[in-house]
Amino acid sequence: IEETKSVVPLDWDQRHTLNVNLNVGVPGDWTVGMIFQYGSGQPYTEDPRISQGVRFENGGVKPTFYNVDLRADKTFDFDGFKINTYLLVYNLFDIRNEFGVYTTTGRANVDLNANYYTQSDIIGLNTIPEYVNNPSMYSSPREIRLGLGFGF
């Protein structure tokens, strides 16, 4: 007997993506640029206990995400030398996008299995709430970089 075939969303499938790049300024003097990214949620496989015993591969969808990055540049000329100063801000609005999710909820901060955990189930020195609210399931926080570049 042949198995029933079906189309299954791949782990990286994403229905909607939007990338917008905006730059203004005077090239060689100053520029400011922003990159906006939006993406609908990617699939994950739900826990069959939550989906009434029916398990569909990649049947759940993670939350949407968005991000804004900023770059500002200013160039100075000194006796034939060019000095470029810049500011980079990754995740400008410090958004906590949920990239990893629990299969029981589809969220990064709620695990319905947490009610059944005991302290001996948790590896390390974390409490159960600390274990559930795992920072590695979120996007990186805001990061600010200042820099200098030299040219001849």
Briefly describe each language-model feature range.
Residues 1-64:
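C-terminal extracellular loops and terminal segments
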Residues 20, 70-72, 146-148:
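Membrane-embedded beta-strands of outer-membrane beta-barrel proteins
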Residues 24, 34-36, 70, 87, ...:
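Preference for bulky hydrophobic residues occupying beta-strand positions
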Residues 56-82:
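Active-site-flanking ligand-binding surface segments in enzyme catalytic domains
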